[in-house]
A protein has these predicted regions:
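A structural/positional concept
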Residues: 1-2
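Catalytic core segments in nucleotide and nucleic-acid processing enzymes
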Residues: 7-160
Length: 160
């Protein structure tokens, strides 16, 4: 939790859990995974909304894992605004952040998976996103308002 800096098992009543949730841990086959949110990643020199690490709860070290570039599996941008009029602006800022992430890792000779999650995706930006997905520039994109897409995104992360 944000308050105690300790790992907790999931409570039965998860109402309002997002206020204290900083990271989620699980085991995928033989791999340990941590999905964390809103962390400053030093190599990128910026806060990143969605961060997936290859590590255990102990290895996470209350977020110190951000300095271990080889443990970072995926970084993603989350844009929650639902106003279609602002969707294009969200994509522009999100895409700029994702480009910054890829460039920072490229300077270190590393590849990084990236994702874009948004509550509003309009036609023009959908075409740009699709082209990036086809080229492999962007690893995954999803619309938060489409349940099937959100489930697919969660499955992609879980199986990473």
């Amino acid at each position: 939790s944000n308050d105690t800096k300790k790992w907790h098992t999931l409570p039965e009543d998860v109402a309002l859990i997002e206020g204290n949730l900083k990271a989620i841990a699980w085991k995928s086959g033989r791999n340990n995974r941590i999905l964390a949110f809103n962390l400053n990643i030093p190599i990128v020199k910026n806060n990143i909304d969605i961060c997936l690490f290859d590590t255990t709860m102990e290895g996470y070290g209350n977020g110190k894992i951000v300095r271990e570039v080889d443990r970072i599996l995926m970084l993603g941008e989350l844009k929650g605004g639902i106003d279609p009029a602002g969707a294009d602006e969200h994509w522009k800022t999100g895409n700029t952040a994702l480009t910054r992430i890829r460039n920072a890792f490229k300077k270190e000779g590393k590849d990084i998976a990236t994702s874009f999650v948004a509550a509003a995706i309009e036609k023009k930006m959908a075409d740009e996103i699709f082209n990036q997905l086809k080229k492999g520039t962007l690893s995954f994109a999803t619309n938060l308002t489409k349940d099937e897409q959100l489930v697919n995104y969660c499955n992609w992360i879980i199986k990473f």
